[in-house]
């Protein structure tokens, strides 16, 4: 195979695995996605929503994790069939150009710039946890150290390193979080499924809705993570293994085989991040809501630590801090890895660089790998309100999801398809789309009606 996974030719062709066990060997993009998803504010946003709403809004978390998967699959399928990244596909969406770039490309660029605040909040949360573990270093020092470590791990741009480190981190925080939820049944905060079902509400207050919509934008596959998934599918080799499109029966069979591998990858990832995200919410609802404690900026980490210390005991505080570090740092790590691909691709579509040139791409990835973490660090050191920063980024992500939905519809009905999708696939896609649009519009209306943002 070529050293550049973005170049597709006859020499890159590989037949897809047929057995389930063999398919497992080709999973990977979903691991990186899970590291980004579970870390990207779930510890903060999801637990805070649980603390505010109790079990009433649990349905939003489940909906958020499940609803966006079909859109993610449509993006992954399009990438495998066309070899295009999400940004390259956005450049072919209908609509006007602004300068050299399509409106959709500019929209992603603006959204990512606004989301600098969100990731800055996550990086800041990581620094706060490290300061609690090692107080001899200030939060300022840990913020800069975290930025430097993230950059040093990513700047060479090796996919295999990113995948392996992502898998390690999600394993650690998954075990810790699920263990904490399990042992909750031996405490006064135990609950049953009847508590969840009987307390579910669909008419939420404006304040809770603002947090819920922010959480909906962050939890599950967020808009920027759907975009990022296309790069990981390419760098894992799925598109290159299919080979150049030629419409032969052999090509179609090979394409369907690798699409099936991608489907399995996405389902495994969904199972992982849904389980952990739901656990965070339930811990927040069972422990913090019951105690009447909602995380705030002054006692954010101390309050969040209760979800572990109240189930695993006071001795687990260190375990929470270590687990919290991996949860938040995994998001910084995976987001940086993704954005180092997306930003150079955007620059290429705007005519500033050439993403197709592997040497130029590697240089830009290296530069962006160092610029972004320190930009995130600067936003945190300037604002110093990680909770608001994380939730505000979720709001931006919810808006960007509207464009992602439009792109998914364009891929499905206007761009290349291997064959006409079945009724089940189309039904799932439309449920996904309606859920995203419905919750997004509902949230905007409720927020402006109550004029309560946080």
Regions found by a protein language model. Give the residues of each.
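Membrane-interface "cap" regions at the ends of multi-pass membrane proteins
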Residues: 1-42, 102, 214, 238-243, ...
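C-terminal membrane-solvent junction of multi-pass transporters and transport-like membrane proteins
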Residues: 168, 351, 355-367, 391-444
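Hydrophobic alpha-helical segments and their helix-loop junctions in multi-pass secondary transporters
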Residues: 171-207, 212-231, 405-417, 439-451
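Extracellular/periplasmic helix-exit of transmembrane alpha-helices
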Residues: 70-81, 233-234, 240-241, 271-302
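Juxtamembrane transmembrane-helix boundary signature
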Residues: 33, 60-95, 107-114, 334
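Flexible loop linkers connecting adjacent transmembrane helices
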Residues: 6-11, 46-48, 73-99, 130, ...
């Amino acid at each position: 195979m070529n050293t550049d996974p973005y170049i597709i030719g006859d020499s890159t062709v590989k037949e897809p695995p047929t057995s389930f066990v063999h398919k497992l060997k080709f999973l990977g993009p979903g691991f990186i996605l899970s590291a980004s998803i579970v870390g990207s504010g779930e510890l903060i946003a999801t637990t805070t929503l649980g603390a505010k709403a109790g079990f009433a809004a649990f349905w939003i978390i489940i909906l958020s994790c499940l609803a966006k998967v079909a859109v993610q699959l449509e993006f992954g399928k399009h990438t495998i069939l066309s070899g295009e990244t999400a940004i390259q596909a956005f450049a072919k969406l209908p609509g006007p150009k602004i300068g050299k770039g399509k409106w959709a490309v500019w929209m992603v660029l603006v959204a990512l710039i606004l989301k600098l605040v969100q990731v800055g909040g996550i990086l800041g949360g990581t620094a706060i946890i490290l300061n609690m573990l090692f107080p001899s270093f200030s939060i300022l020092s840990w913020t800069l150290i975290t930025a430097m470590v993230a950059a040093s791990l990513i700047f060479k741009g090796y996919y295999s390193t990113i995948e392996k480190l992502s898998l390690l981190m999600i394993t650690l925080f998954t075990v810790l979080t699920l263990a904490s939820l399990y042992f909750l049944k031996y405490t006064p905060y135990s609950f049953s499924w009847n508590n969840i079902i009987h307390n579910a509400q669909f008419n939420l207050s404006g304040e809770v809705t603002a947090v819920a919509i922010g959480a909906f934008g962050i939890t599950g596959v967020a808009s920027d993570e759907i975009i990022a998934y296309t790069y990981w599918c390419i760098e894992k080799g799925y598109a290159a293994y299919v080979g150049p499109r030629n419409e032969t029966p052999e090509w179609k069979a090979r394409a369907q085989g690798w699409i099936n591998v991608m489907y399995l990858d996405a389902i495994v990832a969904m199972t992982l991040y849904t389980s952990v995200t739901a656990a965070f919410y339930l811990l927040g609802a069972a422990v913090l809501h019951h105690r009447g404690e909602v995380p705030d900026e002054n006692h954010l980490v101390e309050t969040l630590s209760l979800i572990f210390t109240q189930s695993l005991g006071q001795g687990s505080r260190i375990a929470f801090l270590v687990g919290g570090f991996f949860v938040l740092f995994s998001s910084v790590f995976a987001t940086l890895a993704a954005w180092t691909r997306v930003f150079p691709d955007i620059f290429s579509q705007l005519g500033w660089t050439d993403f197709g040139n592997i040497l130029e791409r590697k240089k830009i990835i290296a530069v962006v790998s160092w610029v972004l973490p320190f930009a995130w660090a600067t936003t945190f050191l300037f604002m110093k309100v990680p909770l608001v920063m994380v939730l505000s980024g979720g709001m931006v992500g919810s808006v960007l999801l509207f464009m992602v939905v439009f792109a998914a519809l364009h891929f499905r009905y206007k761009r290349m398809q291997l064959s006409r999708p079945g009724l089940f696939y189309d039904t799932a896609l439309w449920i996904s789309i309606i859920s995203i649009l419905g919750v997004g519009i509902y949230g905007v209306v409720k927020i402006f009606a109550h004029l309560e943002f946080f």
